[in-house]
Amino acid sequence: MPTPTKGPRLGGGPAHERLMLANLAAALFEHKRITTTVTKAKRLKPYAERLVTFAKRGDLASRRRVLGLISNKGVVHELFTDIAQAVENRDGGYTRITKIGNRKGDNAPMAVIELVLEPVSAKQAVVAEATSAAKRDADKKEAAAAPAAETEVAETEAAPEAEAAEAPKAEAAETEEAPAAEEAAEKPAAEEKDAK
């Protein structure tokens, strides 16, 4: 037995339900906001967001999948060009449902469902700008470091010879300092034992 779709039934059969959702999605993408019942808006939200996700991918296979659901080529073109670019930096949450009260004739609860096309948030825009600036600075530093690295290589080739001459002198100085440091460490320890 086929499993029924999640969410409330929209009346009619499953084919009528699919066509109704496709038409609501096409109207939403064409007009950017539509007024409908709360139940239809709640069923439309995941459907429309899934289509926007396909549009963000932007490849031919995704376009053909959306064209299989929405037959209006003009709406699909607008979805893949305008809407996908507007929500490029947004990870989900492409639609917003706002309840507007009940309908006058049959007292059905109504809602406005609209596309969220404004930028994600000012803070995230600033963070994105800062990260891009940091990348540019890092690239500049790498470019400046490349000539400096060549001169460092020449200096490091000469440095081992100088270090080899300095090494015996440093070892002799360390051996002289080591016993003096041990004696200095033993004196405070002995004083602490006497104080107890």
Swiss-Prot record:
Region Disordered: start-end pairs: 133-196
Pfam families given in the database record: Ribosomal_L17
Record's compositionally biased regions (Acidic residues): 152-164
Matching PROSITE patterns: RIBOSOMAL_L17
Compositionally skewed regions (Basic and acidic residues) per UniProt: 134-143, 184-196
Gene Ontology MF terms: structural constituent of ribosome
GO cellular component terms listed in the entry, alphabetical order: cytosolic large ribosomal subunit
Key words, A-Z: Ribonucleoprotein, Ribosomal protein
InterPro entries xrefs: Ribosomal_bL17, Ribosomal_bL17_CS, Ribosomal_bL17_sf
The keyword ATP-binding appears for this protein: no
One GO term of the biological process aspect: translation
PANTHER family according to UniProt: LARGE RIBOSOMAL SUBUNIT PROTEIN BL17M, RIBOSOMAL PROTEIN L17
HAMAP family: Ribosomal_bL17
Entry's family note: Belongs to the bacterial ribosomal protein bL17 family.
Subunit and interaction comment: Part of the 50S ribosomal subunit. Contacts protein L32.
Protein name: Large ribosomal subunit protein bL17
Gene expressing this chain: rplQ
